[in-house]
Every structure is written in C-alpha cells, then in structure tokens.
Amino acid sequence: WFLEYSTSECHFYNGTQRVRLLERYFYNLEENLRFDSDVGEFRAVTELGRPDAENWNSQPEFLEQRRAAVDTYCRHNYEILDKFLVPRRVEPTVTVYPTKTQPLEHHNLLVCSVSDFYPGNIEVRWFRNGKEEKTGIVSTGLVRNGDWTFQTLVMLETVPQSGEVYTCQVEHPSLTDPVTVEWKAQSTSAQNKMLSGVGGFVLGLLFLGAGLFIYFRNQKGQSGLQPTGLLS
C-alpha cells in the first residue's frame, strides 16, 4: 500500500497585503513536490517529484491557474473568515519571574511569560534600566493552547546587579499601548527588610483589630447596665 496526499497553506502578512500560497505534495509521508507562489512554478523536493514538476511547469494554463489561486483560494477564503477569525482579539497575560531564587551577581534566567493571546503575531522585548537588551535572549516561539489562543516564553540570560530594573515589553494587536512588567533586582538583605516591614505592618493591623474589638465589646457591655442608687 502507499499514501499520497497534498496540503495547501495560505500565509498572510499584514492582512492580505502580501499573501503566499504553498502547495505541498507527499508520498508515504515524504514531501516530493511543492508549488510556491513566491517562486511561481513547481519545484521537485526529491527525485520522485521531478517528473511531475517538469510536466506541470510545461502547461502554461495550469501553471497560471495555480498562480491565480493566491486570489481565488487564499484571499477569497480570508474574506469569508474575516467575519469571525480575523477581528477576534484576546489580550495577553504577562508575568515576569526568575528561574532561580539565588543571590544577586550570579547567572540567572529571567522569564517573560506571555499567555492566552490571539492572534499569534506578537512582539516581546527585554529592557535593562530602560535600555533594550539585544543579546542573551531565548524564546520558545509560539505555542498553541488548543483553544485558538497562544502562549510564549521569552527568556533573558543575565547576571542581575542590585538596584537594576528589568522590563518585559509586549506589543500585540489587541493592545492600544504596549504592556510592560518590571522585575527589580534586590539583595537578600533588602528582601528581608521588605518582608520584615510587611510582616510588622500586618502584625500591627492584627493588634489594632483586636484592640478595637475589645473596646467596642466593653462599650456595648456598659450601655446595657442599669443605673443604681436612684431613689424612687
């Protein structure tokens, strides 16, 4: 037995401003022939596809028909789907965190997690103290969630110094303005001081609440007592 099939892919850039049609032909799961509208003719991927490529390229009418499919197939279907898929916009959720909880001035990987967004075209940039980082950036690329939304991780390799501010900036068609999320590099002592301050504040609130509770309870008890020593 054998398996022979083909696929048609429409690639859109900036709406329908630029459209690329890619038709791929397979034999037993191996691609042997393709038509690329950017090339304008059939090209053999393996020797098995060479006879078909030569045959179809020698037929001007058939070749012109495949070139026109950019409009008759791709742009035509885009206009149909435009009513549902293209206008759909889902804003991304952005979070920033380090992969390791370790002292500063050690190699670390900062992660900018961008999730649950649609469409898939998105731009994620890293900044350190307001200056864009161009090197040390690793990305997972787009990952499909299976519900018409996407996610991606864009990581920055760095050695954080105390006081530095790292910013992940995300631009997406669903956003009127870029979203920025900051991560501030703090020493262990600074983190401990901050946690102590927060803990003291919470403890103070607890004591205040307990004091108010006792005060109002006593006030209620006193208001319920009957006056004594009055002559009738």
UniProtKB/Swiss-Prot annotation:
<keyword id="KW-1064">Adaptive immunity</keyword>
<dbReference type="GO" id="GO:0002250">
    <property type="term" value="P:adaptive immune response"/>
</dbReference>
<dbReference type="InterPro" id="IPR011162">
    <property type="entry name" value="MHC_I/II-like_Ag-recog"/>
</dbReference>
<protein>
    <recommendedName>
        <fullName>H-2 class II histocompatibility antigen, E-S beta chain</fullName>
    </recommendedName>
</protein>
<comment type="similarity">
    <text>Belongs to the MHC class II family.</text>
</comment>
<dbReference type="InterPro" id="IPR050160">
    <property type="entry name" value="MHC/Immunoglobulin"/>
</dbReference>
<keyword id="KW-0391">Immunity</keyword>
<dbReference type="InterPro" id="IPR003006">
    <property type="entry name" value="Ig/MHC_CS"/>
</dbReference>
<dbReference type="InterPro" id="IPR014745">
    <property type="entry name" value="MHC_II_a/b_N"/>
</dbReference>
<keyword id="KW-0325">Glycoprotein</keyword>
<keyword id="KW-0491">MHC II</keyword>
<feature type="transmembrane region" description="Helical">
    <location>
        <begin position="194"/>
        <end position="216"/>
    </location>
</feature>
<feature type="disulfide bond">
    <location>
        <begin position="10"/>
        <end position="74"/>
    </location>
</feature>
<dbReference type="InterPro" id="IPR013783">
    <property type="entry name" value="Ig-like_fold"/>
</dbReference>
<keyword id="KW-0832">Ubl conjugation</keyword>
<feature type="domain" description="Ig-like C1-type">
    <location>
        <begin position="92"/>
        <end position="182"/>
    </location>
</feature>
<keyword id="KW-1015">Disulfide bond</keyword>
<keyword id="KW-0472">Membrane</keyword>
<keyword id="KW-1133">Transmembrane helix</keyword>
<feature type="disulfide bond">
    <location>
        <begin position="112"/>
        <end position="168"/>
    </location>
</feature>
<dbReference type="GO" id="GO:0019886">
    <property type="term" value="P:antigen processing and presentation of exogenous peptide antigen via MHC class II"/>
</dbReference>
<dbReference type="InterPro" id="IPR003597">
    <property type="entry name" value="Ig_C1-set"/>
</dbReference>
<feature type="glycosylation site" description="N-linked (GlcNAc...) asparagine">
    <location>
        <position position="14"/>
    </location>
</feature>
<feature type="topological domain" description="Cytoplasmic">
    <location>
        <begin position="217"/>
        <end position="232"/>
    </location>
</feature>
<feature type="region of interest" description="Beta-1">
    <location>
        <begin position="1"/>
        <end position="90"/>
    </location>
</feature>
<dbReference type="Pfam" id="PF00969">
    <property type="entry name" value="MHC_II_beta"/>
</dbReference>
<dbReference type="InterPro" id="IPR036179">
    <property type="entry name" value="Ig-like_dom_sf"/>
</dbReference>
<dbReference type="Pfam" id="PF07654">
    <property type="entry name" value="C1-set"/>
</dbReference>
<keyword id="KW-0812">Transmembrane</keyword>
<dbReference type="InterPro" id="IPR007110">
    <property type="entry name" value="Ig-like_dom"/>
</dbReference>
<dbReference type="InterPro" id="IPR000353">
    <property type="entry name" value="MHC_II_b_N"/>
</dbReference>
<feature type="region of interest" description="Beta-2">
    <location>
        <begin position="91"/>
        <end position="193"/>
    </location>
</feature>
<dbReference type="GO" id="GO:0042613">
    <property type="term" value="C:MHC class II protein complex"/>
</dbReference>
<feature type="topological domain" description="Extracellular">
    <location>
        <begin position="1"/>
        <end position="193"/>
    </location>
</feature>
